[in-house]
Amino acid sequence: MTRTITVEGMTCEHCEQTVEEALSDVGGVESATADRESESATVEGDADDDELVAAVEDAGYEASA
């Protein structure tokens, strides 16, 4: 399953990598990509939306599903 979440606060490539790594650590995530220009992240897998949002927020960014 593919889902997209909104991520605010990414300003550079390092930010994108940080969000991708945080999302990849969530159980059920097969892959994750972040895009600062669209302020979003796309996740492949069966992870829970609340867990995805929490992982991004724990990494220091605002997120919503």
What are these regions (language model features)?
Residues 1-65:
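Acidic, polar-rich N-terminal leader regions of halophilic archaeal proteins
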